Amino acid sequence: MAGEEGEDEAASIELQLEHHLQEQRASLTAVDEALAADPSNADLLEVHEELLAAIKDAEEGLLHLKRSRLVKQIDEIFPNQEPTSEAPEVAVDPPDDVEPEPLEPQEFSVGSKCRFRHKDGRWYNGCVIGLEGSSDARISFLTPTSENMSMCKFFLQQRCRFGSNCRLSHGIVIPILSLKQFTPTRWQQSLVGSSILAASGHHSGLWRRAELESWDDDLKVGQVVFQDDGSSARLPSDSLSISEYADESDEDGEGSSSDEGSDFSEDGDQEDESVHQGLGLLESKNLSGVQTETAIFAKWEHHTRGVASKMMAKMGYREGMGLGVSGQGMLDPIPVKVLPPKQSLDHAVAASEVNDSVGPGKKRSRGGKRKREKKFAEQARAAKAEEEERSVFSFINSQLVGQDVAEGSAVKSKKDSSGEANGHAKKEDRRSLLAYDDEVKELRSRVEKLEEMMKRNRKDKAFYEAASKKLKQTRKALADAEATHASATNAVARKEKEKKWLKF
């Protein structure tokens, strides 16, 4: 009876696999048609690859079931013959083209490592924590990187009270037939400098991103530097992983992607060595990870891991050479001109235009006899024209202008005398108003900063007193600057008003 039930179960599993295989092939046909219309769609390409992998897995499982059924039938027909004689008859495909047979359920024991495919379509490394009947196994993530991937220790002790609402993982039930053999990573010197995953005990068993700084082949121990906090640790090989995901290939460990990565790393190291020959690094190979000594062309090169030095070396630069096609260095220095404070760039442009107009070989004209004669002649012609056009209105205008000029000169002399008495003999105009405005703004911002500084350092008595004293001085300077700005504003307004009256 038990044998018949086992046969019925195997037949039902075989039918389910065939049904899934047909559905996946139909989906693959639909995806192929969509790709024919849009061959550059990245999502469709990814789905196409996942469907191919799923079809391959289903075909392998179906092949294994059919092979097992045929072997049982042959054993029933020929019970007296040894199974080795029928082995060549059962083999369907050449051994080179067939994946190693999936392990029998009894070969996956509790605690053994394996590879399994998650519901997100990716392959992960896992560990068998329990068997669910004869066909399923409960798997935990071997390299958990998040809390929902970490195994719940209370569930392992059968004491978890949250059930399906637990924020930790209770394992994943996977059919044993879909499990694959675990492929360990071959750690070697060529992987130094690569980004890996490392386990740390003080982070709830989670694996963190790190960089392999060095590797000891004798002790099988690696020095890693964690990327999140910069801490370093010396960990064995079983606490290191080259990636969060497992290798999808069906080859042995010697031909896995770790070897491909090592070959790539070796090529990269050879290229780096050829580059480092012109840089003079002390340890070109051992320092390919977290570098502490580089060919320092500048002080910032220590913090950039020598990236700029490598780029310059690839372009043919050698230490001590000058830049340029023939290494001549900089020929024409960049002109530097210090501008006066609190003036716009228009001042610099005007000054440069004046210098260009004068020319390098000419002297600036300071006037002369001919210019003075020309100026006097123009004034004489203007006076003569006014006398010829003399009328009642011109007489009234001349009288008004004369009175206003006299009053303006009197006011100006009075203001100059009062300004000299107050120490403000400076001419007030719109430009001086801008200077006063900038000074007031600067003092106000300084007062705000000092007030914030005093609020932050109330507990520090010495610092608080010094800041308070500085704040009083700054406020006094601000009050003086505001008063000066107000007086200058009034003076400019009065001057503009006088100009309007003079024009009238």
From Swiss-Prot:
GO terms for molecular function: DNA binding; zinc ion binding. A zinc finger (C3H1-type) spans 146-173. Residues 304-350 form the G-patch domain. Residues 94-104, 245-254, 260-272 have a biased composition (Acidic residues). Keywords: Coiled coil, DNA-binding, Metal-binding, Zinc, Zinc-finger. InterPro entries: G_patch_dom, Znf-CCCH_4, Znf_CCCH, Znf_CCCH_sf. Residues 361-374 have a biased composition (Basic residues). Residues 375-390, 413-432, 493-504 have a biased composition (Basic and acidic residues). Transmembrane segments: none annotated. It comes from the Eukaryota. Residues 40-69, 430-500 form a coiled coil. Residues 77-105, 230-276, 351-390, 406-432, 482-504 are annotated as: Disordered. Pfam families: G-patch (PF01585), zf-CCCH_4 (PF18044). PANTHER family: ZINC FINGER CCCH DOMAIN-CONTAINING PROTEIN 22. This is Zinc finger CCCH domain-containing protein 18. The lineage of its organism: Eukaryota, Viridiplantae, Streptophyta, Embryophyta, Tracheophyta.
